[in-house]
Amino acid sequence: MNNKRHSTNEQLSLDEINNTIKFDHRSSNKQKFLSFLGPGLLVAGGYMDSGNWITSMQGGAQYGYTLLFGNLISRLSAMLLQSMTVRLGIATGMDLAQMTRHYLSRPIAIIFWIIAELAIIATDIAEVIGSAIALNLLFNIPLIVGALITVLDVFLLLFIMKYGFRKIEAIVGTLIFTVLFIFIFEVYISSPQLNAVLNGFIPHSEIITNNGILYIALGIIGATIMPHNLYLHSSIVQSRTYSRHNNEEKAQAIKFATIDSNIQLSIAFVVNCLLLVLGASLFFNSNADDLGGFYDLYHALKTEPVLGATMGAIMSTLFAVALLASGQNSTITGTLAGQIVMEGFLRLHIPNWLRRLITRSLAVIPVIVCLIIFKGNAAKIEQLLVFSQVFLSIALPFCLIPLQLATSNKDLMGPFYNKTWVNIISWTLIIILSILNVYLIVQTFQELQG
């Protein structure tokens, strides 16, 4: 990585929200914390995306609570990587996309941009599919119409942005807590064994010795870190009004932004654990192999004998509501991440509505095409979701490695560069995640061919 200095005429990351939310470094710690409470919510939404739902619930249904430990490891890994993006954004005034373009040679940066754009599209595809399926389950809206409806999210986002970024944070927070409370209720109704749940957070040798458990554990760990979240977080932490030239204020901003991130990621961790616990408590030792998609999960909840007809109907409906909320939540964050990547790599100066419409259209079009080709076949559309998750695995090293190189660069980061122990852990994590994702890609294609 070149040691070029940050250009003074570099366009601000998400300039319409950059440096717009008040942060007074002289205020109380409580006020500072409240000032920085918000960006982590948008990031947490990405860790609760619909693409991870099936893995969690199917893992619980097949192997009980054993995989809760894998969930814990994935969340601790996410906390470390997101804290690095926080430091990058605040210390340098650049987001990850800008940094990659600015400090890598142009040909390499272009390759990284293409992969980043495809990763954003892959993320968005999962949300479009999840939202379209939720609308179909709740209101019997055809999938193709549901996919087209998701385009309207772009204009809703533009409308809300007029009233400030805090409104976006509040809406995302509302959606996250909607999902959280739905699954708290569903897990309560499913009556899991508390001792068995707690025991699931202890590592078991089965995770390594049982190929089936290992595969899903790798899926939980490897697919949890979302590329778009790294671009997103490095940008939106710059929405606060700390001094860009005062290291003391930067240090405070990093401290409270990291606290915010860790709290919100803990909430996402709870949600993903609840999904796994729900799958384990209702479907363990049953026909877990039949829980391959959202429709399967919906109908399994609806017809589960333990719940009864009335409660089964309530549980399945709430599941669809949570799926819709999760899709809308991730739609907002995915659209913003798409804008960050496009601006950061290309320096495009086009109207916000057009930029966001392009980002969303690139995700909706493949879904629409597949719906037409497969005549609305839900199983085929859910298979497209699997392919989108595979591509995210491919794309992950292309944002993790620049992040690691940048945050360990003293000339770039100043006093906020990675300490030796952070470098050791992060490089180890990056290597392991990359190996896991290669393994997942191979296994996924073997399953699809089989």
From Swiss-Prot:
Give the disulfide map.
none
Keyword terms, alphabetized: Cell membrane, Ion transport, Membrane, Symport, Transmembrane, Transmembrane helix, Transport
Q: What is its main location?
A: membrane
| Record has Plastid as a keyword | no
Q: How does it sit in the membrane?
A: Multi-pass membrane protein
One biological-process term from Gene Ontology? iron ion transmembrane transport
One Pfam family per UniProt = Nramp
The GO cellular component terms are: plasma membrane
Any one Gene Ontology molecular-function term assigned to this protein's record: manganese ion transmembrane transporter activity
PANTHER family reported for this sequence: NATURAL RESISTANCE-ASSOCIATED MACROPHAGE PROTEIN 2, SOLUTE CARRIER PROTEIN FAMILY 11 MEMBER
Record protein name field? Divalent metal cation transporter MntH
* Organism for this UniProt entry: Staphylococcus aureus (strain MRSA252)
